[in-house]
Amino acid sequence: MPLYEFCAENITLLEKAFQAGARRVELCDNLAVGGTTPSYAVIKETVRLAKEYKAKVIVMIRPRGGDFVYSDQELAIMLEDWKVARDLGVDGLAVGVLTADNQLDKDAMLRFIQASQGFELTMHMAFDQIPLEDQASTIEWMKEVGVTRLLTRAGSPETDLKLRLERYKEYAQLADGQLEILAGGGISLENRQLFLYLPGVDQVHGTRVVF
C-alpha cells in the first residue's frame, strides 16, 4: 500500500493532510530555503495531532538554509535539536551532511545514526548534490550503516521527468529492499501515481501529495 508523506512547515494543514491520507509527516520550518529545524512547540503539537491519526512524525534537523556543509558548532546544535525532538516523541529525523566537495560527510552522518538508534533516519535531498558517479557507492554505504530511507528528487528541478523515473528505478535496484526510496520534488496528487508505479518505490513526499 502506498505511503504518502506530507511535508509541513507548520501545523496549519496537518489535520487536513492526515484526513486526506498522509500517514507520515516531515516537519520543518522555512520551506523557502528548503526547510530548517522547527520549533519545540510546533514539534510537540505535531506529535499530539499525529498520534490521533496514527501517523508518524519525521523532524527536519537543519540549522539554516544554504549548503549542507556544517561546522562543528552547527553539528553540535543539530545533535542537541535532535535530542529535544526525540524526547518530544517524534519517530525519526531527516538530515543530510556533505563535505565541501559534495560527498557525503560519513563521520558526521555516523554521529546522527548513533544518536538515533531505535528511530528512523531519512537522508534528505542533500543527496541530490552528490555527483552522479558517486551516488551508487553512497547508497551502498547508507545500506551498510542502517539509514532507514533516502528522500530524493532523482535530479534537479530542471531534470527531465523521464530521466528522473529511470533514476528512481536504478536507486530502488541498488537499495535492494535494504533502504527505502522516498520520491520527492514536484510530486502532487495528480502525478503521484507515475512514481508509485515504479518497482521498489511505494512512498512519495511533498506539500501537494494528498490534496
Which residues make up each language-model segment?
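Hydrophobic faces of well-ordered beta-strands that scaffold small-molecule active sites
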Residues: 2-8, 25-27, 57-61, 93-95, ...
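Catalytic cores of alpha/beta
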Residues: 9-20, 66-84, 121, 128-145, ...
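Glycine-rich phosphate-binding active-site loops on the catalytic face of alpha/beta enzymes
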Residues: 22-35, 84-101, 145-160, 199-211
